[in-house]
Amino acid sequence: HSNGGEIEMADTITVFKGDGIGPEITDSVLRILDAAGADLNYEVFNVGAAEYEAHGELIPKEGYASMEKTHILLKSPITTPLGKGFRSLNVTLRKKYDLYANIRPAKTNSAVKTAFENVDIVIFRENTEDLYAGVEEMIDKDTVHSIKIITRRCCERIIRAAFDYAVSHNRKKVTCVHKANIMKMADGMFRDIFYDISKEYPDIEADDKIVDNVAMQLVMHPEKFDIIVTENLYGDVLSDLVSGLIGGLGLLPSSNLGKDFAMFEAVHGSAPDIAGQGIANPTAFLWSACMLLEHIGKNDVAAKIRKAVDLVLEDGSVLTPDIGGTATTIEYEKAIIAHL
């Protein structure tokens, strides 16, 4: 599967139910997808801490077999089991499928009161290298050497992914965010490759900004940004900053793309404190599912769902407790389906 170029029509997707509120929001989202006419088959697996307690593995073997076949994962929140020797499932999947692009859209909506009204930013964060490659050593007992790795291959693919997304989603501008004034070689290369690739996309405006300036601009004039493409560390920080602009992580979807694998999930965690109470908000996970639909070319279905959610949020009479209402997950889900 690729975001933009040759799109395979996938009608079977792998779904991980996860921990905490994961199973509840998964059930709701799959029912909404069906009601919207998404026309998908689901291979659903219980995954996470509970699965590990029961069977000694985070992901059942059948789950891996399913992903090898479908190349698409819709993943609800998962708790990493406590104890030594556990990488988070995301790190495991990122390494296994070389998920090089972390994509975080942040868009204001009427349900959450924030200081800004028309934020609509998508951050493309390189997911595999930079300082996060984890190459560190103690030179002596008082000195650590930490290495920043930037490669042409990884720069090219994240930058191309951002421009392809701009084309397929009718966006106008891509901004390269860097610190090339200080890291002239590493970030200089990232910026230079950005402008080289931008020439292949004459209809998309391309500019670059220094990361500290971007942090300031984002909290003053976030509406001036469209798509941001950046390295791993800057992307990690800026994507959470942008989340704060629109009221926090609770309503944010994300996707992780590899060359032939894509994973879609909500940014929020498994919220064990409200699990099983039937009041979880499925919106972020639903929007993650909309990103999945767009990825496989079902843009019309995604648009229909987004519109229905917007109408329910605007109406404001059927909202879950986290966004100021008293509705249950099921009531909220039914309101969305009624607006389809």
Q: Predicted segment positions?
A:
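Glycine-rich phosphate/nucleotide-binding loop
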Residues: 49-51, 217-317
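N-terminal glycine-rich phosphate/adenylate-binding segment common to multiple enzyme folds
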Residues: 52-148, 233
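Flexible, glycine/charged-enriched surface loops at secondary-structure junctions
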Residues: 41, 169-178, 201-209, 298-306, ...
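Buried hydrophobic positions in well-ordered alpha/beta secondary-structure cores of metabolic enzymes
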Residues: 19-22, 71, 124, 162, ...
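Short, Lys/Arg-enriched N-terminal segments with co-localized hydrophobic residues
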Residues: 1-8
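Buried hydrophobic packing segments
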Residues: 29, 33, 194, 285-293, ...
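N-terminal beta-loop-helix "entrance" segment that forms/cooperates
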Residues: 40-61, 218
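Glycine-rich phosphate/diphosphate-binding loop of Rossmann-like nucleotide-binding domains
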Residues: 14-35, 140-212, 224
